[in-house]
Amino acid sequence: MEEFKGYFEFDRTRQQNFLYPLFFRESFYVLAYDHGLNRLNRNRSIFLENADYDKKYGSLIVKRLILRMYEQNHLIIPTKDLNHNPFFGHTNLFYYQMISVLFAVIVEIQFSLKLVSSFEGKLLKKSYNLKSIHSLFPFLEDKLLHFNYVVDVRIPYPIHLEILVQTLRYRVKDASSLHFFRFCLYEYCNYKNFDIQKKSILNPRFFLFLYNSHVCEYESLFLFLRKRSSHLRSTSSEVVFERILFYGKIQHLVKVFVNFPSILGFLKDPLIHYVRYHGKCILATKDTPLLMNKRKYYFVNLWQSYFSVWLQSEKVNINQLSKDTLEFLGYLSSLQLNPLVVRSQMLKNSFLIDNVRIKFDTKIPISSIIGSLSKEKFCNVLGHPVSKSSWTDSSDSEIRERFVRICRNLSHYYSGSSKKKNLYRIKYILRLCCVKTLARKHKSTVRAFLKRLGSGLLEEFLTGEGQIISLIFPRSYYASKRLYRNRIWYLDILFFNDLVNHE
């Protein structure tokens, strides 16, 4: 990172970042290949999109691309001819793909350098456990007990490419880079019938860069307004976010809501917790039904008026946690109200006190999981196990290892469930599916195969889970039944494991 820092240093009196010359440097294409793509997708990279490519020719491909960019007239080819005009064995689409990834890497480095410089001289607390997906659930368990409503919003996608380009203008001031990026984006996406919601982009890094830029602009504005309009002169956000005519846009937004003065009034309440996940976001607060409806229409008008993005009111759901369930990261979350009667006695008088105990309840969505298992041919739609015929060509040990891995991953992730009954049902489906698969491979019945194999097969499914729990809890506590009734949140789950992928 230090060797590339000099390329991003600029004269702060002019406040300009000239990124366009970096597209003609071969070293940055190497950085995009080594640093970027291998981390996101190790089994696939941009240089391997062409079947005839060999690694030793990577430098030659980059040099040809740079030479072709110098010859601008030869780079511009109609979209319909993109795939019919190969250049030295590679299509123009292949080169547009390389440029798009390079643009994402360059801008990411620029933002990271600014972010590091903004924290110089400050002490930052490092907590690697907060990276875990399960770390959100203890937070919600602690905070949602004091709130009664949750606004569940599906973040809309921009319907036009120019909206994405305009979003980048707030952070990238180099006009040449933006024009070049706009040209490549339109040419590439027109050929591929671009749809950001369907993720038809071949480069995961480029897609994440566009999506995060879009969401970052939305979040920065929302969090900015949440601190009330009296903070408009705050300069704390200038380090990370650079906008064009930022104050003017805020004034325009206020004019849009001139007929809704009460909508902006609810922003005075600082007790709003915000969480974003899987293209959705939730806001937890303690409000009245009237204020929650105002909050809903605020989101709709914010997206339509400021971001020029159509947001249907049906995509903004208001959930009352005591009555409704919230689908959150694979769990069905809600607040369970348990009545509690306490007998109190003062001197000679005794009386009963009715109290309500609020508990954060997390359940396993058994219907959706069975649907996923049915789609992958582990069971039918009713949840009855079937044999996995596509795995019968593998060895017995490999088949058992695949099923045990899937069962272990599910047990590991859904260990935070309040009720383990549904988890045991999923384990039963996988165990019996494994037995049926092995019996089908050996052309035997399930009963005869289990009689010949014994109980050793079923013990393998319990060994993996037992080893994990025994490393955390003492043996006496692990052996007790109380452990299986309590929820366990693991802080080492950084991503969702593919249940079927065995590579």
UniProtKB/Swiss-Prot annotation:
InterPro entries assigned to the protein according to its UniProt record, in alphabetical order: Domain_X (IPR024937), Maturase_MatK (IPR002866), Maturase_MatK_N (IPR024942)
Domain of life according to the entry: Eukaryota
RNA-binding among keywords: yes
GO MF: RNA binding
Record keywords, A-Z: Chloroplast, mRNA processing, Plastid, RNA-binding, tRNA processing
GO cellular component, one term: chloroplast
Family: Belongs to the intron maturase 2 family. MatK subfamily.
Cited function: Usually encoded in the trnK tRNA gene intron. Probably assists in splicing its own and other chloroplast group II introns.
Name assigned to this protein: Maturase K
